[in-house]
Structure formats: structure tokens, C-alpha cells
From Swiss-Prot:
This is Acetyl-coenzyme A carboxylase carboxyl transferase subunit beta. Disulfide bonds: none annotated. InterPro entries: AcCoA_carboxyl_beta, Acetyl_CoA_COase_Trfase_b_su, ClpP/crotonase-like_dom_sf, COA_CT_N, Znf-ACC. Residues 29-293 form the CoA carboxyltransferase N-terminal domain. It comes from Synechococcus sp. (strain CC9902). Binds 1 zinc ion per subunit.
């Protein structure tokens, strides 16, 4: 038997399907900035609050990452975790609303699109709500509205300041009027919080649109935003078609809204925690143990 025949016999006896493909060494280790194209080690990116070191682009982060950046370690006490949405209208478009809910819950590990609770920031007690855009685009349904309302009421009862981190496409259309009424419900709770002379700060992140913008996102004592965040009510294309005019390139950005008086200040994510602590102290908020509040 020649050497060529020996190799041919060896190939016949092999089953290609048994060959195991090794994963790429770099899978999940690197991130490319969509703004400047800089490739960064993912661990280093997260150490910089998911902000690009080259151009300052703010990558989107989930609710757990946001909580870790804002609250003192091990200080966050979640509220109303058990609340979960139902499908009151039996809504179905291309897919059933119930299926969309199950898919989002499985992908995020959350019951709905907001995490609420009490925490400390540099020792100062406060209420904190963080919307998560991964859950159906951060849309506001009845559970999102109820959790935020209960948090506002708890802060009013305990005399605590409040921060809501907004990231939403607006009201959840699959719940119809039940989602729209959350705008008024949250706004009413915030008015009672204001009457108690307590501080409310919304942080507008990318994107903050629709019914969220039209309600609690714009009701703060100071309206804060992240750099280059998309902030608006209707979409750019809808406005252009309605007005029949071309809009500026930076229209509906945080910088544009600040220039026109709708946003008070823009705070880079890497500086937000220290700035928030300063604002709380300026308002007269004091260090306290939340369990004794």
C-alpha cells in the first residue's frame, strides 16, 4: 500500500461532523465603538462606565450596570419586584403580546422594564428607578407606571429625594389606554412629592421619547441628561413631514435641548455619581440608614 492509499483510507474512516470547532479567542472580549471605530478591551470599557475613551461615546448599559454605577455598594433595596404585567387586551400584532413579554422576561431576567428601590449615594438616602431599554424598548406599561408611582409615594412618605433614569420608547401600545394613563398617575404622584418640598431629578439617557418625555421625564427640579442622548416626543421623520421642513442635524439631542432651555445640564456618565452626591447635599439631603427612615 502506497502512502497516498494509506491517507485515502484514513479520510474515508473519518466523520467530519465529529470535528469540534474551537471558539474564537476574542469572542466577547472586545468592543468596537460605533462612533469612532476604536476597538477596546471589554473589561476596560466597563471600568470606564461603558464610555469610549477615544471619543466619549456612551454605550447603552442595562439596569444592573446602571445601579452599580449610581448606588453605594450593597445599599440598593428593591421594591415591588413581584409586580409583573398581564395581557388585559389580548393584544396581537405580528406576534402576541404575551409572547413578547415572555421573551423579554427570559432575555433580561426582569419582570418588566423598570427596577425601583431605595439606595444610598455617598451615604445619602434616596429613591431610585432605572428603566431598562432591553425590555420591549423600555416601554411604559401599567406595571412600569405602578412601580414608579409606588416609589414616588414611598419617597414622599420617607421624605427622600428621588432619581429616575429614563430610557424608553414611550407608552406601551399593547396595553392601550392602560399605558397612557400612567403618564397622569406618575405626574400626580410627583406633584405630591414636590408639594412636600422634596427633590426630584430625572436623568435622560439614550433614548428618551414618547409618553415618558411627555410626562415624568420633564417634571424634575433639575433635568439632567447624558451626552448626545436622543430626547424627544415624536420621531424626526414625523416632524419633518408635518412641518415640511428640514430639521437641524443635532435636533432632539441632549445638547440641542440644553441650548433651547429644555435640559438644565449634561453630565458625562463617569462624573454622574459625584455630581449627584453634590446635588443631593446642595438640596440639604442628609446621610441616613434607609431601614430606619
Amino acid at each position: 500500500m502506497s502512502l497516498f492509499d494509506w491517507f485515502a483510507d484514513r479520510r474515508k474512516g473519518q466523520y467530519v461532523g465529529n470535528v469540534k470547532q474551537e471558539p474564537e479567542e476574542g469572542d466577547g472580549l472586545w468592543s468596537k465603538c460605533p462612533e469612532c471605530g476604536l476597538v477596546v478591551y471589554l473589561k476596560d470599557l466597563r471600568l470606564n462606565a461603558s464610555v469610549c475613551a477615544g471619543c466619549g461615546y456612551h454605550h447603552r448599559i442595562d439596569s444592573s450596570e446602571r445601579l452599580a454605577l449610581i448606588a453605594d455598594p450593597e445599599s440598593f433595596q428593591p421594591l415591588n419586584e413581584h409586580l409583573a404585567p398581564i395581557d388585559p387586551l389580548g393584544f396581537k400584532d405580528r406576534r402576541a403580546y404575551a409572547d413578547r413579554l415572555r421573551e423579554s422576561q427570559s432575555a433580561t431576567g426582569l419582570n418588566d422594564g423598570v427596577v425601583t428601590g431605595l439606595c444610598r449615594v455617598d451615604g445619602i438616602g434616596m429613591g431610585l428607578a432605572v428603566m431598562d431599554f432591553r425590555f420591549m424598548g423600555g416601554s411604559m406599561g401599567s406595571v412600569v407606571g405602578e412601580k414608579i408611582t409606588r416609589l414616588v409615594e414611598e419617597c414622599t412618605k420617607r421624605k427622600l429625594p428621588l432619581l429616575i433614569v429614563c430610557a424608553s420608547g414611550g407608552a406601551r401600545m399593547q396595553e392601550g389606554m392602560l399605558s397612557l394613563m400612567q403618564m397622569a398617575k406618575i405626574s400626580g404622584a410627583l406633584e405630591r412629592h414636590r408639594e412636600a418640598e422634596l427633590l426630584y431629578l430625572p436623568l435622560l439617557t439614550h433614548p428618551t421619547t414618547g409618553g415618558v418625555t411627555a410626562s415624568f421625564a420633564m417634571l424634575g427640579d433639575l433635568i439632567l441628561a447624558e451626552p448626545k442622548a436622543l430626547i424627544g416626543f415624536a420621531g424626526r421623520r414625523v416632524i419633518e413631514q408635518t412641518l415640511r421642513e428640514k430639521l437641524p442635524d443635532n435636533f432632539q439631542t441632549a445638547e440641542y435641548l440644553q441650548d433651547h432651555g429644555f435640559v438644565d445640564t449634561i453630565i458625562p456618565r463617569t462624573q454622574f455619581r459625584s455630581t449627584l452626591a453634590s446635588l443631593l447635599r446642595l438640596h440639604g439631603s442628609k446621610s441616613l440608614e434607609l431601614t430606619n427612615a
